[in-house]
Amino acid sequence: MARYIGPKAKLSRREGTDLFLKSARRSLADKCKLDSKPGQHGRTSGARTSDYGTQLREKQKVKRIYGVLERQFRRYFAEADRRKGNTGENLLQLLESRLDNVVYRMGFGSTRAEARQLVSHKSITVNGVVANVPSQQVKAGDVVAIREKAKKQARIVEALSLAEQGGMPSWVAVDAKKFEGTFKQMPERAEIAGDINESLIVELYSR
């Protein structure tokens, strides 16, 4: 699947907020002007953004946060809409339970992109079986671990150390010494980033 490989800071500036694509622990706020759009002088517009434009921007932001392209994102939305309950919350839970995101949330990768690479390079197991599909859905009770051959990688050790200092989500339990973690349960909406307005995405696809 194609992936955006350009400057990560540019995407955060485009959305006007730090998407933590460079690092989950270090903010870009001190390095670049997040309230200034990309471009030589930072493009500005006096025109009021339409409702559609606002909804579209929110969808683009969430796609970039989780590293998902349009076709796959539409499939996630269709599945979220099919399930019982709140469609927006279902969508976020589907994205949060992707294997690459769970690896990131457990602190094995400093960014989702790095976590995705660990999965693609077969450095991750799920319930003892090697997994190499970043979009694999992790279920409650699944044990995600770093393979023995990858445990000495400096980037993994550093990422895990930083994650321990910053704290991990309550819906994962990580044993840093064993380089493994358990996906305890689906996260509740309050446990997912509060700067996402999923209702705008639901409104967009309901047009």
From Swiss-Prot:
<dbReference type="GO" id="GO:0006412">
    <property type="term" value="P:translation"/>
</dbReference>
<dbReference type="GO" id="GO:0003735">
    <property type="term" value="F:structural constituent of ribosome"/>
</dbReference>
<protein>
    <recommendedName>
        <fullName>Small ribosomal subunit protein uS4</fullName>
    </recommendedName>
</protein>
<comment type="function">
    <text>One of the primary rRNA binding proteins, it binds directly to 16S rRNA where it nucleates assembly of the body of the 30S subunit.</text>
</comment>
<keyword id="KW-0694">RNA-binding</keyword>
<dbReference type="InterPro" id="IPR005709">
    <property type="entry name" value="Ribosomal_uS4_bac-type"/>
</dbReference>
<feature type="compositionally biased region" description="Polar residues">
    <location>
        <begin position="42"/>
        <end position="53"/>
    </location>
</feature>
<dbReference type="InterPro" id="IPR001912">
    <property type="entry name" value="Ribosomal_uS4_N"/>
</dbReference>
<dbReference type="GO" id="GO:0019843">
    <property type="term" value="F:rRNA binding"/>
</dbReference>
<comment type="function">
    <text>With S5 and S12 plays an important role in translational accuracy.</text>
</comment>
<feature type="region of interest" description="Disordered">
    <location>
        <begin position="31"/>
        <end position="55"/>
    </location>
</feature>
<comment type="subunit">
    <text>Part of the 30S ribosomal subunit. Contacts protein S5. The interaction surface between S4 and S5 is involved in control of translational fidelity.</text>
</comment>
<dbReference type="InterPro" id="IPR036986">
    <property type="entry name" value="S4_RNA-bd_sf"/>
</dbReference>
<dbReference type="InterPro" id="IPR002942">
    <property type="entry name" value="S4_RNA-bd"/>
</dbReference>
<dbReference type="Pfam" id="PF00163">
    <property type="entry name" value="Ribosomal_S4"/>
</dbReference>
<keyword id="KW-0699">rRNA-binding</keyword>
<feature type="domain" description="S4 RNA-binding">
    <location>
        <begin position="97"/>
        <end position="160"/>
    </location>
</feature>
<keyword id="KW-0687">Ribonucleoprotein</keyword>
<dbReference type="Pfam" id="PF01479">
    <property type="entry name" value="S4"/>
</dbReference>
<comment type="similarity">
    <text>Belongs to the universal ribosomal protein uS4 family.</text>
</comment>
<dbReference type="GO" id="GO:0015935">
    <property type="term" value="C:small ribosomal subunit"/>
</dbReference>
<dbReference type="GO" id="GO:0042274">
    <property type="term" value="P:ribosomal small subunit biogenesis"/>
</dbReference>
<keyword id="KW-0689">Ribosomal protein</keyword>
<dbReference type="InterPro" id="IPR018079">
    <property type="entry name" value="Ribosomal_uS4_CS"/>
</dbReference>
<dbReference type="InterPro" id="IPR022801">
    <property type="entry name" value="Ribosomal_uS4"/>
</dbReference>
